[in-house]
């Protein structure tokens, strides 16, 4: 997109929101759409704010289902919901990962068209904290939960991938065993990919160079991606090493297209990884679903890391956008890329036509007195739409999307079915702002 006027494009595509969710009194910092069959037969929304409040939303009635206050009122960074066990992981700025279970004795399906007088009665849903552990959150990084490859019939086992407790340039991998007692093991401690790449002289990286802290995690199939402060992205998977007779980390992806700018967000769609930074572009990497088996490796047994000797820097394609400082990114269906910038603007970009189709902002509606001798009152707009609007738009604290979905009509009354279909037939962009509101926007 060269030679266009950013201001004209963004103003021309400005779109009003369809719905607003109001409950939070502080800035939204985390959003996630999940499936929770024990609660609702349609997807629900999780939201968290910078004062430790967590809300589960009914997206059909646009009302809270249940809410909870994290002890210490600590800024919520990220969620992860494990549907099979009704367990919710919440990472907070006080460097604690808290694990909650939805009380099975109180679960029931929600009547999606209940009366107004019943709408806020959420006592039937209870969250029980079953564990908490320290995690380094200096960088506001998220975390990854993935199911173990070989679960047993007696319990369910998961891997937790997160920043190392003390060194936020490295990671830890825990094994979480959910049984009657809830067990935690740490088979990988302080995995240091920057040190490994320097030792192997990969890309001629100087041993004195700094990767900085890990900014974001993402997962695509069995590959975990780390986005660093210096713009590098590395991807690895856990494989069994015959020589060591144990699992080790195998590097399968390295890229540095955002260097030296920090990775601000990553998302996955199909077999593609998307990343963003302070640049005015998104990088897109196509990741093979079935990685080829290698016979020759570079390795460091002390670090428990290896990589194929044929590994090279991945070559991405770039999607140029009329925004910089892109803090949030998501993908909808095959065509639409949704991005939010530090300016408070969110755009829907059609990758097939290379056009911005929608722009969402929440304005503070501040009048600014001009210094001009003409003495006019303006809304602060200028030639640079993004920079001029930065102080006049509410900042985006979190953004996520919900794709259209099929509806099972069995057992639903006509009114229920109509309201669910109104949600299910559309793609949605959900944006949480610093004033505590959450906007629902049809795409």
Swiss-Prot record:
List every stretch annotated Disordered.
Answer: 372-391
**Residue stretches of each WD repeat:** 23-67, 71-110, 258-295, 318-359
Which InterPro entries does the entry link to? WD40/YVTN_repeat-like_dom_sf, WD40_repeat_dom_sf
Asked if the record carries the keyword Lyase, the reply is no
Q: What is the stated purpose of this protein?
A: Component of the ASTRA complex involved in chromatin remodeling.
Q: Which PANTHER family match?
A: GUANINE NUCLEOTIDE-BINDING PROTEIN SUBUNIT BETA-LIKE PROTEIN 1, TRANSDUCIN BETA-LIKE 3
Give the protein's recorded name. ASTRA-associated protein 1
Q: Which organism is it from?
A: Saccharomyces cerevisiae (strain JAY291)
């Amino acid at each position: 997109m060269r030679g266009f006027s950013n201001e004209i494009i963004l103003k021309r595509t400005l779109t009003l929101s369809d719905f607003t969710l109001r409950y939070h009194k502080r800035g939204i910092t985390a959003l996630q759409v999940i499936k929770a069959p024990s609660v609702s037969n349609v997807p629900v929304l999780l939201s968290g704010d910078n004062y430790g409040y967590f809300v589960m939303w009914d997206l059909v009635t646009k009302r809270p289902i249940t809410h909870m206050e994290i002890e210490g009122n600590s800024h919520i960074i990220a969620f992860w919901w494990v549907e099979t066990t009704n367990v919710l992981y919440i990472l907070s700025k006080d460097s604690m990962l808290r694990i909650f279970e939805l009380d099975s004795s109180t679960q029931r399906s929600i009547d999606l068209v209940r009366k107004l007088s019943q709408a806020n009665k959420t006592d039937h849903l209870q969250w029980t904290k079953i564990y908490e552990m320290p995690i380094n959150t200096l960088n506001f990084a998220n975390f990854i939960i993935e199911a173990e490859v070989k679960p047993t019939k007696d319990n369910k086992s998961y891997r937790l991938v997160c920043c190392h407790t003390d060194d936020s340039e490295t990671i830890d991998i825990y094994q979480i065993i959910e049984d009657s007692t809830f067990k935690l093991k740490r088979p990988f401690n302080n995995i240091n990919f920057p040190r490994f790449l320097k030792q192997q002289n990969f890309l001629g990286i100087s041993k004195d160079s700094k990767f900085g802290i890990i900014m974001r995690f993402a997962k695509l199939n069995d590959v975990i991606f780390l986005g660093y402060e210096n713009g590098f992205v590395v991807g690895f998977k856990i494989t069994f090493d015959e020589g060591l007779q144990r699992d080790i980390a195998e590097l399968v992806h390295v890229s540095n297209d955002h260097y030296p700018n920090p990775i601000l967000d990553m998302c996955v769609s199909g077999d593609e990884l998307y990343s963003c930074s302070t640049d005015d572009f998104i990088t897109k990497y196509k990741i093979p679903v079935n990685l080829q088996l290698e016979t020759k490796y570079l390795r460091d047994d002390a670090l428990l890391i290896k990589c194929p000797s044929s590994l090279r820097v991945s070559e991405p394609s770039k999607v140029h956008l009329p925004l910089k400082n892109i803090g949030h990114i998501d993908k909808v269906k095959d065509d639409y890329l949704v991005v939010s910038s530090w300016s408070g603007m969110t755009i829907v970009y059609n990758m097939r036509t290379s056009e911005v189709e929608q722009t969402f902002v929440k304005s503070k509606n501040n009048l600014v007195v001009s210094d001009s001798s003409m003495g006019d009152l303006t809304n602060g707009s200028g030639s640079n739409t993004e920079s001029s609007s930065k102080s006049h738009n509410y900042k985006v604290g979190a953004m996520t999307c919900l794709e259209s979905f099929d509806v099972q009509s069995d057992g639903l009354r006509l009114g229920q079915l109509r309201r669910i279909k109104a949600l299910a037939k559309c793609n949605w962009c959900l944006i949480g702002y610093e004033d505590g509101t959450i906007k629902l926007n049809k795409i």
